[in-house]
A protein has these predicted regions:
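N-terminal beta1-alpha1-beta2 submodule of the flavodoxin-like/Rossmannoid cofactor-binding fold
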Residues: 1-108, 182-227
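A short acidic, helix-capping loop that chelates divalent metal ions and anchors anionic groups
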Residues: 170-175
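Short, glycine-/small-residue-rich phosphate/pyrophosphate-handling segment
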Residues: 95, 108-160
Length: 227
């Protein structure tokens, strides 16, 4: 399987969320070796979409001549896109949002109705492509935190998507937190293996992964410097 990892964190490899992403990929590779290419979007030259729609009218050619041309070509050659990013103001960091905006050349001006919504018709066949979102945040729980990012991801990629959201994720880069983070990374690694084998993750396993690692009030006290 060809996997394109899109890291939206400005921290690159030291991202808390990338700790989870690496564990997931390690699990996938246990089920069979994959070709993995990790891209730190902060290091790529990606201009902002101007909304001119030129790309939708001329076969996908964007007015900007930057790194997106090569990234779009790689998307078409991939089997799985992993969107790895921390929660910024309840949504995606700017590098990730700029990247997604610039995938517009993969769509055409034509629209079709799917259920109750209208969507643009693709300019290529994406039926084989799967999408995985891995997102961490520094809050003690998930309630009223991830909803915006999750909703946007589902709208952008309505088919073949899987979503992992984990609170208290800054602990993944704290050595003293290893007694609680290592078991969680082991679960994420297990999820990667299951995903590679079956294309899905059991709801029970997802629930374990997405739950707080330590009691919410304890985490809040540590974050506030009260413990």
């Amino acid at each position: 399987m060809k996997i394109m990892v899109l890291n939206g964190s400005p921290k690159r490899e030291t991202s808390d969320t990338m700790c989870m992403t690496r564990a997931f990929i390690k699990g996938m590779n246990e089920a069979g070796e994959n070709a993995v290419h990790t891209i730190h979007l902060i290091d790529r030259h990606i201009e902002y979409c101007t909304g001119c729609f030129s790309c939708m009218k001329n076969g996908g050619e964007c007015i900007h001549k930057d790194d997106m041309k090569g990234l779009l070509e790689e998307i078409l050659e991939s089997d799985l896109l992993i969107f790895s990013f921390p929660l910024y103001c309840y949504g995606m960091p700017a590098p990730m949002k700029a990247f997604i905006d610039r995938t517009l050349p993969l769509s055409s001006m034509a629209m079709r109705k799917v259920g109750e919504r209208y969507e643009h018709v693709e300019q290529a066949d994406f039926s084989h492509l799967k999408y995985l979102m891995i997102c961490g945040c520094g809050f003690p729980n998930s309630q009223h935190n991830f909803e915006l990012a999750v909703a946007q991801f589902k709208l952008c990629f309505p088919n073949h998507h899987t979503i992992i959201t984990v609170p208290e994720s800054p602990m993944f880069n704290v050595l003293e937190a290893a007694p609680v983070t290592k078991p969680r990374l082991a679960l994420i690694r297990q999820a990667g293996r299951r995903y590679a084998e079956s294309g899905k993750i059991e709801p029970e396993l997802l629930e374990q992964i997405c739950s707080p690692m330590i009691p919410e009030d304890v985490y809040a006290k540590i974050a506030n410097g009260e413990a």
